[in-house]
Amino acid sequence: MSLNVIALGGNAILDTDPTDEGQKAVVNHAAKYIAEFVAKGEQVIVCHGNGPQVGNLLLQQKAGESEKNPALKLDTCVAMTQGSIGYWLQNALTNEFEKRNIAKPVISVVTQVRVDKEDPSFKKPSKPIGPFYTKEEADAEAAKDGSTYVEDAGRGYRKVVPSPMPKEIVEKEAVRALVEADVLTICSGGGGIPVVAEDGQYVGVEAVNDKDFSARVLAENVDADRLIILTGVDNIYINYNQPDQKALEQISVAEAEEYIKEGHFAAGSMLPKIEAALDFVKGDDKRKAIITSIENLENIDKEAGTVISQKG
């Protein structure tokens, strides 16, 4: 039995239908594959992103702001999306386990992630959140509140916020205890609520952590065997969308680093996933990181997807 940390993207959850029902339907679809994976005897911790959701929630907060109903800060919005998406996943997985007669409890944990208050991202926001805009729409939004908008992997323009590098999962001991009790745990949602340590206390900061880097830290903190990062394609590609594109199957740390140097991976898209995978497997021959689609999860034991390991 392997311990697997599975990272599910927020963009995958909010695909085309931003309604409550639409996002639940996507989560229900993902839960079927995760349940089948668990049915094979695998231990699983589920993390999820929240980029579109937290951005939309922040817009709702700003739109409804008044003296008696002030907008909540970004770290609180991250916590709120942990609750909503965690509920959807918890409900969907519980239902799928019931269908399969799997006697495994499911729980969502509100998770704080310690970051460095001196992290350079606080001065240079880089994490895209919220909806996509045209260039004209983004310029108009930026003029309203001075926020920064950047192009996101050719899909349009999005607001960017600080995204400090995760250092530690504050609730890691609780997560370990739940795993040892054979509880499927949903945690570190949206990359975790970013907090800094000040005078022996944890204090929330306005930022959104990258869920793949947080999943990597979580996988290290609980000594997971595999980090599985789910995305919209079955494999990583080099020369993506070119006539000579090539799917990568099993690659070493050295090979992945060379592909990064050659500029094959977009900074706001596949690059952070690969960097998180590399950080997890470096220096440990037993660990594997796998990047693939949710539909390919059932084939992972057959070396499906892109498998990154120390030696390839």
From Swiss-Prot:
CDD domains registered for this protein in UniProt: AAK_CK (cd04235)
Disulfide-bond pairs as recorded: none
Location(s), subcellular: Cytoplasm
SUPFAM superfamilies attached to this UniProt entry: Carbamate kinase-like
Name of a matching Pfam family: AA_kinase
Its EC number(s): 2.7.2.2
Record key words, sorted: Arginine metabolism, ATP-binding, Cytoplasm, Kinase, Nucleotide-binding, Transferase
Family statement drawn from the similarity comment of this UniProt entry: Belongs to the carbamate kinase family.
Cited NCBIfam families: arcC, PRK12352.1
Protein name: Carbamate kinase 2
Organism: Enterococcus faecalis (strain ATCC 700802 / V583)
Lineage per the UniProt record: Bacteria, Bacillati, Bacillota, Bacilli, Lactobacillales
